[in-house]
């Protein structure tokens, strides 16, 4: 897996690794500098387009608080990725951040993978498919 870069977007530190057909992005809150005007999800989408990869794993274990605006951005990013045959997986979420995702009504959209390996190699069907099974 190639180590691609470390960037800052919208007050977030992004460490990007590229694997076969995957982008793995470690996200951390960056309070050292002023945020730019580009939303986190938009920067992530640009990375996906730049690498022609629409499967994205976000490692969120270094994010203290995932706010509602960012959660909604990630929901939209998941929709766009799916429109391109990909998807977004979240891993390393704290219990508090996972509860925030659920409170935003997205517990059926995302699954709380433990780490990047689980996110890449384990399949958890969307909630709608789990109901039908």
Give each language-model segment a name.
Residues 20, 94, 116:
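Short, flexible active-site-adjacent loop segments at beta-strand->alpha-helix junctions, enriched
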Residues 30-110:
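Amphipathic alpha-helical interaction surfaces in cytosolic regulatory modules
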Residues 2-43, 60:
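STAS-typified acidic loop motif
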Residues 109-120:
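Short acidic-hydrophobic, aromatic-tinged amphipathic segments that line or gate anion-handling sites
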Residues 1-4, 99-101:
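Intrinsically disordered, low-complexity segments enriched in polar/charged residues with Gly/Pro
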Residues 120-133:
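Acidic/histidine-enriched, glycine/proline-rich intrinsically disordered or flexible terminal extensions
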